[in-house]
From Swiss-Prot:
One of its GO terms (molecular function) is structural constituent of ribosome. Gene3D superfamilies: 3.100.10.10. It comes from Schizosaccharomyces pombe (strain 972 / ATCC 24843) (Fission yeast). This is Large ribosomal subunit protein eL18B. The keyword Ribosomal protein applies. GO terms for cellular component: cytosol; cytosolic large ribosomal subunit; preribosome. InterPro entries: Ribosomal_eL18, Ribosomal_eL18/eL18-A/B/_CS, Ribosomal_uL15/eL18, Ribosomal_uL15/eL18_sf. SUPFAM superfamilies: Ribosomal proteins L15p and L18e.
Amino acid sequence: MGIDIERHHVRKSQRSKPASENVYLKLLVKLYRFLARRTDSRFNKAILKRLFQSKTNRPPISISKIAALTSRKSASLEGKTTVIVGTVTDDERLLTVPKLSVAALRFTKSARARILKAGGEVLTLDQLALRAPTGSNTVLLRGKKHAREAYRHFGFGPHKHKAPYVRSEGRKFERARGRRKSRAFKV
């Protein structure tokens, strides 16, 4: 006699592989899937999960943000390798780049050049796997997910100060009722 289960043919909601067809990403997934299985390290499981994520969920992080987070006295991150599953971008507002050790999925050309010029090192995630197979002496960071322009529009409602989708940015558009006291009310 069989058991009648309510949940028939229900797919798991989380990703089990990246949606991207990028062969280099697939090789990294293969590597970190092996490491996550064979080592008892939560670091490798976290890296693997982030490799599955969509591009919008792998936001970029700037070298100025990395420098600010690693230079904190309380964090005690001296000599540790910063790991980012995403892109490391340059920030021209940062005048002097400190000596950094960064491992990431990809780097912008100028970010890579500035880190290397400062005497730091730039690693790929497969090079990191050889150096720290269990993630020892590393710190995992990620960029701000809600920094995208699209997030200005999400969650619309009263008193939320969300940006409306407008057909034009001119004086006559979305500037009247609800935006000025003289036109009924101001939110």
